[in-house]
A protein has these predicted regions:
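Conserved phosphate/anionic-ligand binding catalytic regions in large, soluble enzymes, centered on
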Residues: 3-30, 257-265
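A short, contiguous, amphipathic alpha-helix enriched in charged residues
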Residues: 103-128
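Short amphipathic beta-strand starts and helix->beta connectors
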Residues: 3, 80-90, 124-132
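Conserved glycine-bearing catalytic or ligand-binding loops at nucleotide- and phosphate-handling centers
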Residues: 20-82, 112
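Long, charged, helix-rich clamp/arm modules that form nucleic acid-engaging surfaces
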Residues: 54, 58, 106-107, 130-267
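A common structural junction motif
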Residues: 40, 44, 122-126, 163-169
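Hydrophobic side chains in well-ordered alpha-helices
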Residues: 32, 114-117, 157-158, 266
Length: 267
C-alpha cells in the first residue's frame, strides 16, 4: 500500500502460510524514519551504523531486551532471537518487608495467564518467600505487586520468576515478506531499500497522474481561449446549427482547429 511511513516495520506483523511463517516485531516510528533518512544519505551504511539510529524492536508492552547480539543478527540476516525481560522495581514497606512491582511485561504475554502461572508456583512452593500477589493494573498501566517475607531474598525470587514464568521470554524474529510478489527473508536494510523504492514508485505515479490531469485541463482551457477569441462566430455557429451535438462539435473542430474534447467542453 502507498503508506506514508514504513508500516511493516513500525507495526510489525506475524502470520503463517503453507511452509513458511513471518514474525516481524514493531519498531519505534521516529527511529525507523530516521533510519530511512540514514539509508537515503548513505546506501552503503553498515548494520552497526544503522543500529545507532534504530536501536532495535520497540514493543508496546515495554520490557527490556537483553543484549544486542540477537538484534544485530536479525538486522543482518532477517532472522534472529531476542530475550525480553519484564521491568520491575523493588520497594521497601513501612513494616520492613519488600515488594516487587512489575510494570512492563514481554510482548504478546497474556497478563492473566502470567499471574495464574505465578500464583500456581507460589502455591506449589516452587517459589518461596512470597506472602502476597495481586494484579493492580489499571488504565494508567500494568502493575503486578508481589510482597515478600522479611527474610526473603528478592534476587533469588526474581531469578526463579524469570526462569519459570513468561516474565522473561524469547521472541523469534523472522522478517519474511513479499518482495516483487515472491516471499523473501529480508535484512533490515533490504526492507528499508524496498520501502524507499516503493515510495519513489508511488510519488512518480502520483506525479504522472497529476501531470496528465493538468495537461488535460490545460488542453480544455486552450480550447476555451480559442473560443473566446472568436466568441461571436462560435455563438452564431451554435445558434444557427441544425445538427446534433456530435455534428456541431465536428463543425467547431473544422472551423477553429479544435479537438473533439475541446469542442465538447465549449458546448
Amino acid at each position: 500500500l502507498p503508506s506514508r511511513y514504513p508500516n511493516l516495520l513500525v507495526n510489525g506483523t506475524s502470520g503463517i502460510a503453507v511452509g513458511m511463517a513471518t514474525n516481524i516485531p514493531p519498531h519505534n516510528l521516529s527511529e525507523t524514519i530516521q533510519a530511512i533518512f540514514a539509508v537515503m544519505d548513505d546506501p552503503d551504511i553498515t548494520v552497526p551504523q544503522l543500529m545507532e539510529v534504530i536501536k532495535g524492536p520497540d514493543f508496546p508492552t515495554g520490557g527490556i531486551i537483553l543484549g544486542r547480539k540477537g538484534i544485530r543478527q536479525a538486522f543482518e540476516t532477517g532472522r534472529g532471537s531476542i530475550m525480553i525481560r519484564s521491568k520491575y522495581r523493588v520497594e521497601e514497606l513501612s513494616n520492613g518487608k519488600k515488594q516487587i512491582i512489575f510494570y512492563e511485561i514481554p510482548y504478546q504475554v497474556n497478563k492473566a495467564n502470567l499471574i495464574t502461572k505465578m500464583a500456581s508456583l507460589i502455591r506449589d512452593k516452587a517459589i518461596q518467600g512470597v506472602t502476597y500477589l495481586n494484579d493492580e493494573s489499571n488504565r494508567e498501566g500494568i502493575r503486578i505487586v508481589m510482597e515478600l517475607k522479611k527474610d526473603a531474598q528478592e534476587e533469588v525470587i526474581l531469578n526463579q520468576l524469570f526462569r519459570l514464568t513468561p516474565l522473561q521470554t524469547s521472541f523469534g524474529i523472522n522478517m519474511l515478506a513479499l518482495e516483487n510478489g515472491r516471499p523473501k527473508q529480508l535484512p533490515l536494510k533490504d526492507i528499508i531499500h524496498d520501502y524507499i523504492d516503493h515510495q519513489v514508485d508511488v510519488v512518480v505515479r502520483k506525479t504522472q497522474f497529476e501531470l496528465k490531469k493538468a495537461q488535460d485541463r490545460a488542453h480544455i482551457l486552450e480550447g476555451l481561449r480559442i473560443a473566446m477569441d472568436h466568441i461571436d462566430e462560435v455563438i452564431h455557429m451554435i445558434r444557427s446549427s441544425k445538427k446534433d451535438e456530435a455534428g456541431l462539435s465536428q463543425d467547431l473542430c473544422d472551423a477553429f482547429g479544435l479537438s473533439m474534447i475541446q469542442a465538447k467542453a465549449i458546448l
